[in-house]
Amino acid sequence: MTIGVVGRKCGMTRIFTEEGVSIPVTVIEIEPNRVTQFKTEETDGYRAVQVTVGERRASRVTAAQAGHFAKANVAAGRGVWEFRLEEGEFQAGDSIKAELFTAGQLVDVTGQSKGKGFAGTIKRWNFRGQDNTHGNSVSHRVPGSIGQCQTPGRVFKGKKMSGHMGAERVTVQSLEVVRVDAERNLLLVKGAVPGATGGDVVVRPAVKARG
């Protein structure tokens, strides 16, 4: 089963093993994922389960969204997420919690990276700076040439240049689940995960560990 869960990044801390080894971990709160729709090949052309988390005021929900949540008999959430499903059955209103994962399991975590605004090539692409002296003036952090002359007469697509940095979908693969706290609905994942504290993250079984 490749289904995952939607959680909220709480921040980072560290825990110690019995041998005294310090392990940096990210704490992810797994609020109950309420199933809003179960899609099948007969009705939708593919198998998937759609979930929502959290709560949203009725004044912040459109009529279409309110009808969708009411049909599933679940409270309106702050969004909907979908997971493709190879096997298993779910019903609208079911709840998916942190017990889906076990300690030692490898997971992929997806989130939105922190926005950095408009960034230059040194910060955005790790370009080296130009000479500080030796005749260089006002060009210490500029990227330099961005192409050739009349042939080809254009800048190639994908050229690394200054621009907006961050605030994009990022996935970190094969992180180890160090601990599962079912009582408090917490996952402790080894290492860092994308995004700022309080941001939504999607935790799935690692694609490279599915065999």
Curated annotation (Swiss-Prot):
Methylated by PrmB. GO terms for cellular component: cytosolic large ribosomal subunit. It comes from the Bacteria. GO terms for molecular function: rRNA binding; structural constituent of ribosome. The keyword tRNA-binding does not apply. Pfam families: Ribosomal_L3. Keywords: Methylation, Ribonucleoprotein, Ribosomal protein, RNA-binding, rRNA-binding. PROSITE patterns: RIBOSOMAL_L3. GO terms for biological process: translation. The modification N5-methylglutamine is found at Q150. Transmembrane segments: none annotated. One of the primary rRNA binding proteins, it binds directly near the 3'-end of the 23S rRNA, where it nucleates assembly of the 50S subunit. Belongs to the universal ribosomal protein uL3 family. Part of the 50S ribosomal subunit. Forms a cluster with proteins L14 and L19. This is Large ribosomal subunit protein uL3. The gene is rplC.
